[in-house]
UniProtKB/Swiss-Prot annotation:
InterPro entries: VapD, Virulence_VapD/CRISPR_Cas2. It holds the Pfam family CRISPR_Cas2. This is Endoribonuclease VapD. It is an enzyme of class 3 (hydrolase). Changing V74A: Protein unstable.
Length: 94
């Protein structure tokens, strides 16, 4: 299982995407969901697939690199392998 995490420069995003700039995050979410990624939090997306996982990361990076406003506003983008993904939300909330 692999994940993608990215950070965008908001001032550049506002200029390149326009207002409301936060809709850009919805657009990215839709694109990544089409490639099998699920939004977890912030700008972190996980692909839970057991097959061709690195290929899915490549497809996602390739797709994102074709979005002009994303290319101009991305500050950092990382892909990483997830060995264990534990949800501690209930422990914290109870």
């Amino acid at each position: 299982m692999y994940a993608l995490a990215f950070d965008l420069k908001i001032e550049i995003l506002k200029k390149e995407y326009g207002e409301p700039y936060n809709k850009a995050y919805d657009d990215l979410r839709q694109e990544l969901e089409l490639l099998g990624f699920e939004w977890t939090q912030g700008s972190v997306y996980v692909n839970y697939s057991k097959e061709n996982t690195l290929a899915q990361v490549y497809k996602a990076i390739n797709k994102l690199s074709q979005i002009e406003w994303f290319k101009k506003s991305v500050r950092d983008i990382r892909a990483f392998k997830v060995e264990d993904f534990s949800d501690f939300t209930e422990i914290v909330k109870s």
